[in-house]
Amino acid sequence: MALLALSAVLQGARAQAPETEVGTLSVVIENDYFARTDQNYTNGWRLQYLRPKGAVSDLTDWLGKTFLDVDDETRIYEGVSIGQNLFTPRDITDPNPQPGEHPYAGYLYLEFAGVVDRTFAVDTLTTQIGVVGPLALGEFTQNSVHQLIASQIAKGWNNQLENEPVLMLSFDRTWRLWRESRKYNFDLLPTAGVSVGNLRTEGRLGFIARFGPDLQDDLGPPRIRPSLAGGGFIAGAPDFNWYFFTGFQARGVAKNLVLDGNNFTESARVDKRNFVHEAEAGVAVHIGGFRLAYTMVRRSREFDTQQDPHYFAAISLTTRY
């Protein structure tokens, strides 16, 4: 319902702006409710706005030209996001500490992004600043939603990680490696990236493959880190289009705050796995300048005492605005 209401508002605003001046607005919701679980990475949401080249700051323009070989024909976007991720153990009805289970943790953040879109590749540089702990409002968010949908209230948030500020820098490159153009098109988009910070420090490799009648030059639907990045922009605005997609990502993880526990105080922790991988599949539909996408994700075990891989779904709505 929220996505439908947002789309109605944005359609009216978008119609009043010249096509060459509009940016891109996207909302992503990830939740394991669709997999009938309520544990580990249990919910995430992110709202992002990307503005086009003519509106980017002098700093973004200088960074692109200095470090990324940007010229006047390159498409550049500058973006800001706000988001929140929630993590819980398997049994949210137990108010006591649960050793060996995923610690309770909330993460609230702002993200600033620069996107450089060239013919052969897209580079994305992001900075996340935020907080882990009670100030991230994880307990309020989860239990407010659970009350709204008449679901079980989580009783163990008193055991969550303590407040800790977070800074994380990330760089990702996605290559437009290969496209087969016939009645139905197929393309392959390899990706590589690295993140450094006290939230996560990791390197990653992966790919996205898409199949459909008219594959635009975007990168697939947006996602929430550390998943496959996708794209926060829409390269075109067809009246109707669709494509199926699948993807895989492998990550080498040196640091994960929500598993390792607080850096400066005693807190719950588990022994993380240094190698994590995930697979995804979904469908995206373009209708009148909007892109609506549904993605199902399987993430491998992230810590030694985790019993099973984790499944969750992502829903995203993107529009030119």
Where do the model's predicted regions map?
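Short glycine/proline- and aromatic-enriched beta-strand/turn motifs that initiate or cap beta-hairpins
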Residues: Q16-S57, I82, L86-I92, V253-L259, ...
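Short loop/turn motifs that connect adjacent beta-strands in outer-membrane beta-barrel proteins
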Residues: Q16-V22, K53-I76, D117-T124, L177-L188, ...
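Transmembrane beta-strand segments that form the barrel wall of outer-membrane beta-barrel proteins
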Residues: T24-Y33, L59-L63, N185-V196, A268, ...
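Residues that define the transmembrane beta-barrel architecture of outer-membrane proteins
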Residues: Q39-W45, I76, Y104-L108, D123, ...
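Long, hydrophobic/aromatic-enriched structural stretches that serve as scaffold segments
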Residues: T66-F140
